[in-house]
Amino acid sequence: MKPAFFRTHPYISLLFPCLLPFASIAPPACGPVLGAQTGAGEVSVREAVRRELHEHPELVLDILKENSETVLEIAQQGNMLRRRKSLLAQWEQDVKQRKIVKLDDRSFRGKADAPVTMVVYSDFTCPYCRQAEYDVSRLLQKYDGKLRMTFKALPKEDPVSATAAKFATAAFLLDPVKGWEFHDALFNGSEQYEREGEEFLKKTAESLGYDFKKLKSAANSPAVRQRLDFDGKEADNLGISGTPHFLINDLMVRGAVGRELFEEAVETALRHAGKQ
């Protein structure tokens, strides 16, 4: 029977494979020599350590505390490997299902005939979206000529998020090229925007050469409302919930997965497009 400690903390037993490398437990004085033959057979160092941990479970917490950074690193690596494995399996299924998205009236970053298209569904007030923007910009640099990107605002229901989406969408409609500058400024200054509201939008727009009255009028126009509604319904049809979300050709990527997984997604898309 397991000690009460393990019955009340069942997850601790699962940590043994990670803990054993850290444990340095000397055999008791005058005890049997490890590796000697006994009635139960040869006793290994690993078995001795495991037995010691079971007999003194408080050592488990001591080992965790003393090696907390290393244990955390191992856990993070394991989580990353598990997530990568799951994504690779998902992507093999994704490429078999064509995703239908509207792109003909959108502004792009990257070469027009790039073999890989990334559609970013994002929110200007989402911290994970801001984090992912940095990775996306690096991807565009690394895969210059092979990757293009467009942006679709997917705001939350709160007015701060919705207003940012309306103004950014209007900026693209008024000037598809300058719209990217507004997009960048809004992401880079999102915290300031959340503090200042429309005043930040006005300063940003005017610094980029927009007529703010025209921009504000466009932001509240039926054209902007229709585009945002369309993109929201498109996201629903794709099974997208939450931001950020990315469609890389037909591969679905949810969340700010980090540079390495983004690169793997692009490489996978290139391979299936025959352009690697």
Where are the language model's segments positioned?
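A short beta-strand-turn-helix
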Residues: 100-116, 141
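Structural alpha/beta surface segment adjacent to cysteine/selenocysteine redox centers
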Residues: 119, 130-206, 236-241
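C-terminal cap of thioredoxin/glutaredoxin-like
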Residues: 41-53, 59, 70-75, 203-276
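The canonical Cys-X-X-Cys-His
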Residues: 123-132, 244-247
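Bacterial N-terminal signal peptides
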Residues: 13-27
